[in-house]
UniProtKB/Swiss-Prot annotation:
Protein name, UniProt field: 3',5'-bisphosphate nucleotidase AHL
Organism listed in the record: Arabidopsis thaliana (Mouse-ear cress)
Lineage of the organism: Eukaryota, Viridiplantae, Streptophyta, Embryophyta, Tracheophyta
Keyword Cytoplasm included in the entry's annotation: no
Function in brief: Phosphatase that converts adenosine 3'-phosphate 5'-phosphosulfate (PAPS) to adenosine 5'-phosphosulfate (APS) and 3'-phosphoadenosine 5'-phosphate (3'-PAP) to AMP. May regulate the flux of sulfur in the sulfur-activation pathway by converting PAPS to APS. Prevents both the toxicity of PAP on RNA processing enzymes as well as the product inhibition by PAP of sulfate conjugation.
Top-level EC class: hydrolase
Cofactor: Mg(2+)
PROSITE patterns assigned to the protein according to its UniProt record, in alphabetical order: IMP_1 (PS00629), IMP_2 (PS00630)
Record family assignment: Belongs to the inositol monophosphatase superfamily.
Amino acid sequence: MAVDSLETEIDTAVRVVHLASSLCVKVQEKLHLPNGGHVKSKDDDSPVTVADFGVQAIVSWVLAEVFGDQNLSIVAEEDTETLSEADSLGLLGAVSNAVNEALSEAQNYGLPKPVKPLGSSEILKAISRCNSVGGPKGRHWVLDPVDGTLGFVRGDQYAVALALIENGKVLLGVLGCPNYPVKKECLSNGCNQAMKTKAVAGSVSKGCVMYAKRGSGQAWMQPLIVGGIPESATLLKVSSVDDPVLATVCEPVERANSNHLFTAGLANSMGVRKQPMRVYSMVKYAAIARGDAEVFMKFAQSSYKEKIWDHAAGVVIVEEAGGVVTDAGGRNLDFSKGVYLEGLDRGIIACSGQVLHEKIIGAVYASWESSSL
């Protein structure tokens, strides 16, 4: 399918991420209330919340309504195993309430609305629909309902990430960043300071939604409005900084997800002076796309396998905003191998431009042999 024919897809994706992000805002407000959290641990001890399941159900249901569910392929992080456990009735009830509350406002976002509230079985079906494993052929929607759930639980940064892949190529991406400030100047007080403002229905939130379509040469940002869609968008452009000394480097917060020691040594070898911008989730890609940072580096432990839903949406947004994203060997990320980014060379490097990217790649090769990664 030609990229030019994706108007319905990008429009639907942007709208449903706005709706899903609004659900997240409301759920996060309740997290620290008595009995308002419903945070559980999955088999790998990572947290999962009402928002994770609620977003996946909403996105799945909307995509099925708009595009039909017969040949709909959705690759997503969550399944229904946790919700099906005997002690999860309260969690399932909270998910159902959140989903139906959000879908009751779907028409405000220009999206279809259920004739009647969805039952638990319908919500579980919607979540279970997202069981595709992707691959080199065909069209696959790729969803991370709440990327950075730990950040979400802590009242910090997180993202709703939706992408469309066809024949192994990412065609579009949308990032909902409910706690990432629309105005850059808010970052001067630190990323985490922008999250204390309560979102009010019908008003501009502190967050934003970013999106891009492959080949357009443009990436866009809209303010996140709880209860509707904004009427305008702002063009995104990466930073023009190409000197590592002046660059801001993004990296994951959790040491388990990245080798901070190696990235610190790498930054030092290039003369980087600024402290790293440590951010949960794909908000790191948002920071690069908007020019708030120039470099995102992630070097996970060798046993860790990167998943496509953690990168697809962010990669296309950065690239269409003028940036470059590759593995540490300078190769494009391969989204055609299924759930995982197979064949990844050491790590992932996203930069605001080709000149800076080449300098980073060169420094990686120079530093690699002396690292303990």
